[in-house]
Amino acid sequence: MTEVYLGIDTSCYTTSLFFMDRQGEKVAEARRILKVKPGGCGLQQSEMLYQHIRNLPELMEEAAQGHEFSLLGIGVSAKPRPREDSYMPAFLAGQGFARSLAALYHIPLWQISHQENHLEAAMWSAKGPEADRFLFLHASGGTTDLLLAEKMAGVAAEKNVNEAATTEKKSGEVAAATKNKKVAGNYTLKEIGCSLDLHAGQFVDRVGVALGLGFPAGPALEQLAAQHTEILEIPVSVHKTEVSFSGPCTKVLRMIEQGNFAGEEKDSDITQVIATTEQAAATVQTATVTQQHYSAANIAAGVQWGLAETFVRMIRNAAKEYNCNDVLLAGGVASNQWIRNLIIEKLAKRQIRVWLPENRYSGDNAAGCAAYARRQSENQGII
């Protein structure tokens, strides 16, 4: 019989389970993307909750097949972000499932936020950063946050763990968090940057659906962009560590609505910035174009370029202001390989080290919940 910690995450579009052993290695996992009708742009919370409730027992059967588990503890995402005012019904499915198992087997239950789950999963997979202080970029459909993570030392870290355990034993909640600074495991997280309007994933999904792709559109957009012949540079809006995707998204959607893509014959007299793949990583040339037709692939590549350039400027500004040379990336948008490569290339010129989890642990998963439960339980000597 294998002793394991169970991680559970029921986000907006994925149901996830993860089993981790005492050595911190994966034993089994199962996840399922929620179904969205073709042409749809999302799900209502009631539909998310319904699908999660149906998925959880089926995924448990799938993950447990061929194994005999002895549960030591459970970690679950209970809300979107580590804030007192953070709430989303979708997480009630996983939270209720976790509480029932914990009560039945009399084992510790650790409740964290979906964002903390991303942090924990990314650190577990990337095996770092090792620095006591680093930047954390969480870019997904529901979040575009840049945070400063600082390791708590000695007595402060021990006090935090004990307080969290006491709080959870009494009320099943994570340690209290303020608006801009919160506790994640043995780290404090300070919000230092964000999107002022659309999140990165919303930008991707809106353009993807307009191009006829399914929802969520991230993986399909990346595949489409791989067919590009040139990269359309879209506007980038960054002020220090605050960014905006609303303007760039509107511009791209207008181009699609006007039909200036996919080989359609339509004259236009507009000025655009165009770059080849190599130029996108270095110098971009400006050209006035007549009779310009943008393929869907070139538009998709332009969206990727705009996201990567936005993240690079955001991280670069924060690294300078907070004197940090390490950044950890997580979130569905951050799993895009082309975006990753461009970020690494550009930040390397500034001696900023980029830490990347495996793609499957950048998007929604439950590995972080399991890793958190394992560390907290064993640090306290509960098991």
Where on the chain are the PLM-derived regions?
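Short beta-strand-loop/turn "lid" adjacent to the catalytic site in phosphate-handling enzymes
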Residues: E61-A98
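N-terminal phosphate-binding loop and adjacent alpha-helix
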Residues: K35-H67
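Glycine-rich phosphate-binding loops at beta-strand->alpha-helix junctions
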Residues: C324-I343
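A short helix-loop
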Residues: E3, T10-S11, F18, V27-E29, ...
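Glycine-rich phosphate-binding/hydrolytic loop that grips phosphoryl groups
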Residues: H118-A121, P357-I383
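Phosphate/pyrophosphate-binding loops at sites that engage ATP/ADP/AMP, CoA/4′-phosphopantetheine
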Residues: L59-L72, M314-C324
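Conserved phosphate-binding/catalytic loops in two-lobed NTP-binding clefts
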Residues: D326-V327, I343-C369
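Conserved phosphate-binding catalytic cores of ATP/NTP-utilizing and phosphoryl-transfer enzymes
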Residues: I107-L135, Y372-A373
